[in-house]
Amino acid sequence: MQKINNINNNKQMLTRKEDLLTVLKQISALKYVSNLYEFLLATEKIVQTSELDTQFQEFLTTTIIASEQNLVENYKQKYNQPNFSQLTIKQVIDDSIILLGNKQNYVQQIGTTTIGFYVEYENINLSRQTLYSSNFRNLLNIFGEEDFKYFLIDFLVFTKVEQNGYLQVAGVCLNQYFSVQVKQKKWYKNNFNMNGKATSNNNQNNANLSNEKKQENQYIYPEIQRSQIFYCNHMGREPGVFKSSFFNYSEIKKGFQFKVIQEKLQGRQFINSDKIKPDHPQTIIKKTLLKEYQSKNFSCQEERDLFLEFTEKIVQNFHNINFNYLLKKFCKLPENYQSLKSQVKQIVQSENKANQQSCENLFNSLYDTEISYKQITNFLRQIIQNCVPNQLLGKKNFKVFLEKLYEFVQMKRFENQKVLDYICFMDVFDVEWFVDLKNQKFTQKRKYISDKRKILGDLIVFIINKIVIPVLRYNFYITEKHKEGSQIFYYRKPIWKLVSKLTIVKLEEENLEKVEEKLIPEDSFQKYPQGKLRIIPKKGSFRPIMTFLRKDKQKNIKLNLNQILMDSQLVFRNLKDMLGQKIGYSVFDNKQISEKFAQFIEKWKNKGRPQLYYVTLDIKKCYDSIDQMKLLNFFNQSDLIQDTYFINKYLLFQRNKRPLLQIQQTNNLNSAMEIEEEKINKKPFKMDNINFPYYFNLKERQIAYSLYDDDDQILQKGFKEIQSDDRPFIVINQDKPRCITKDIIHNHLKHISQYNVISFNKVKFRQKRGIPQGLNISGVLCSFYFGKLEEEYTQFLKNAEQVNGSINLLMRLTDDYLFISDSQQNALNLIVQLQNCANNNGFMFNDQKITTNFQFPQEDYNLEHFKISVQNECQWIGKSIDMNTLEIKSIQKQTQQEINQTINVAISIKNLKSQLKNKLRSLFLNQLIDYFNPNINSFEGLCRQLYHHSKATVMKFYPFMTKLFQIDLKKSKQYSVQYGKENTNENFLKDILYYTVEDVCKILCYLQFEDEINSNIKEIFKNLYSWIMWDIIVSYLKKKKQFKGYLNKLLQKIRKSRFFYLKEGCKSLQLILSQQKYQLNKKELEAIEFIDLNNLIQDIKTLIPKISAKSNQQNTN
């Protein structure tokens, strides 16, 4: 463990001291790397440095050039005494572009191009602006015209823009080194060999076998299109499938061919079109199937013919299925269906508004008619058995497929099955119609299995995509429910038709009105695609969801509405930093919340920690409460938005944390080599293959900037993460900027607020008030609107701070307000002022979500209609704030069942170890990263919360562990996890846990407590978290009956090796327990069934002398 810590410390030390010049010298592709000053001395372009001014000399020493060849001698032979250029710098640059030809260069030509709504400006480019500077003009005079032209072509030129940041202004694009994005393991395999020796002839068969494994692993199986089953409103008169489905494809194709033939033969009277017949339906099926399902996977013509015979049987069997009978048998309508139908009809035909209570009861009755997973599975199994011959997959494989259907039906919204989830449980030798392979070598048999698995994957996808999914889409409406997470529910289409009719009535009564397309302005109608409305069942009502992801093919609009608003979103992203400082009190993320909260804590401590009062409020339906005309007026009058913006894409090449190998060797520090050898099983490293992906990470981002922004402001807007990092980085400005004006954004907002049309069941609606919630600019617009409103009504807070010296903190995250102050009167005045703001601007506060920590007479302030809740602990947006210490902790109210319904387990058997490791790390960081702030919470407070964060992490990780233990390793040896010499889930889970904890602690300690935390506290944190995490994992798995036999053996091993994660850090653990910085109470131990803290402490005390003696003996040896 100490060895790993030393490696990490050396790694951090090296990355902090290095600069870009040192890093580029390690790139094997660059044969020459130097600063510009040394290059000019080597080429004898300059001799006396005293003639150069200080600013230009600094420019030469900080500018780095690099090339794939050493061209110093070439530049010595030309223009030893160059004449001063008579051309402008712009003309020389344009000439260099002509010389460059087809090569990629960052110097752009001048011109404008109109694209859609926008205009591209090729001459406004950060790299080009830098080349137009006086420094490059002086450089042109030193080189001469011809040399300077070739200099821009031959060299990569990086100019310094920040302390450790550079801008590439010329040369070939660095992005070419990242053109092939390969995974790290694959990159290592290409750059390391076994002891530096070539493969011998004796091992040729093994080499062929490994190549076949690579081909099999690299093969991409077709996808199961499960996402298509959701939200299909289409309903036919009779149960079955769509007319455009595979089974009706031959009839459609037949009619289409007759139509084409008639059009071609129009005017040719000498040909009788009645005698011309289209292809036979079986011929059409053959043509389409062989194109769609990769006929190249079939090994011979015999297999192709057999496959087509099976499909013809499937089509014939499908047309003979009685869907009415199967639906009545497995998924019948409720007995009171006719009664529900008559009630809905009565409400729809009624001219008066429907009774609220009767509508709620009717909605609940309709929602209660959902079909269970078991009923749906039995219905699908019966169709597959009647339609598909079991010989197509093999009898045993067919049984496996039917069993897997239940998993397909009950999966959550964003989960999907992989073809490998079926294949790894199937046997290709069970398929009798495959051409058999007898008396062949092992390598040929393996290739046979690999090829047949590909065919088996095509067959599985064919059955699911062409039979299962169309049947579900046509006969059922599949959706989520409100407050049910990602769990899905099935409804019969006749039931959902009643729900839709009742929904249209309620929509007209609320914030939507029917609209005709004739009333929409032609400009807005032609340019913007329409959105789509769907509903999610909610108790007694529904929740409308507007989506803007579809494109309008009829109007030839190739972009959806969110894509059209992408540039406007970039402009509004700049407002996030200004809102809350110049207008209102908006916050957008946990980073802004933490910064404001930390500033308030510092003021509170400086004032002597006075008593605090808080208020939380919630705006009711904030998006629907926005006044559309006021929003447009606020936008036009605001000086925060400039008249013109340029949209450009920047690339960031940021130095990663991998150490420089050459520096490690010269300083006799082998830590970097140790890290690399551990990752590649001690295979020697090829120094000649180090390239940019080894030392740099690539990021890209689009930003919006105005003409008044300087270079530093542009970089800060695009890459905020580089401000807090001291590693070297390179910024590249490659694209041609495009322009967007304030008038264009105004037209977008006008369409959104006044002419935005959405469709529901072929009925067009328009919002009476407010803006849609599903757009990419809705959140910023909402915060901007309410920020302008609250600015007028909160002026008294600024006056109170100046007059009384009170300290106040007011934040609003979209619609949730939080106010903390040392003055109770300020809190009361805020409630009154915000209520006045709501009354004057047509919105309301949710009267059941107002909380304070003090009581007051509501009648005196005209607030008697509010149901104010008094709580000593402030709870706001999932955070709990202790008003005595102002420490923040998370609120975990979800049960394990609710979490299981929310978490989507979208992982495959392939690369399972890395997927689970990354998932566990992200889950824990999401739980703790926002609270690991030394300016807000103390380390002792974090230790007290550690158990709760660990428990919440494991509860969310539990569905993934269930997926792990469901894998049948006996039937799936190829996809089992290799851990040393054993294939066990126990060691696999230990491996995931150990390295995840290592990464998490390194990230947290390095980023937040770098200056004040020491190695002992880091060890305490890591070992304590490991101990709690592992025990909770086992306790949860122990409760599952299907793992009982396995876990009994596992628990025995764990009890014997209880101190697996404590041996190296038990001294630190005993220290923290003796100082009482962290203790588990009885409530915290309820979830851990077999742990006794007192016994554990005694065990640690008895174990320490043994470990100490053993370690001393090892040191002596």
UniProtKB/Swiss-Prot annotation:
Region annotation (TEN) ranges: 1-191
Instruction: Specify the effect of residue 231 to A.
Output: Slightly decreased transcriptase activity
Region RBD, residue ranges: 217-519
> What's the impact of mutating residue 849 to R?
Does not affect reverse transcriptase activity
Summarizing the annotation, the consequence of altering residue 178 to A is: Strongly decreased reverse transcriptase activity; strongly decreased DNA-binding
Q: What happens after mutating residue 532 to A?
A: Slightly decreased transcriptase activity
What Gene Ontology terms describe what this protein does at the molecular function level? metal ion binding; telomerase activity; telomerase RNA binding; telomeric DNA binding
Q: Where is this region: RT?
A: 520-887
Answer yes or no on keyword Nuclease. Answer: no
Q: What is the effect of changing residue 168 to E?
A: Does not affect reverse transcriptase activity
Consequence recorded when altering residue 543 to K: Does not affect reverse transcriptase activity
What is this protein identified as? Answer: Telomerase reverse transcriptase
Organism for this UniProt entry: Tetrahymena thermophila (strain SB210)
User: Organism classification, top ranks?
Assistant: Eukaryota, Sar, Alveolata, Ciliophora, Intramacronucleata
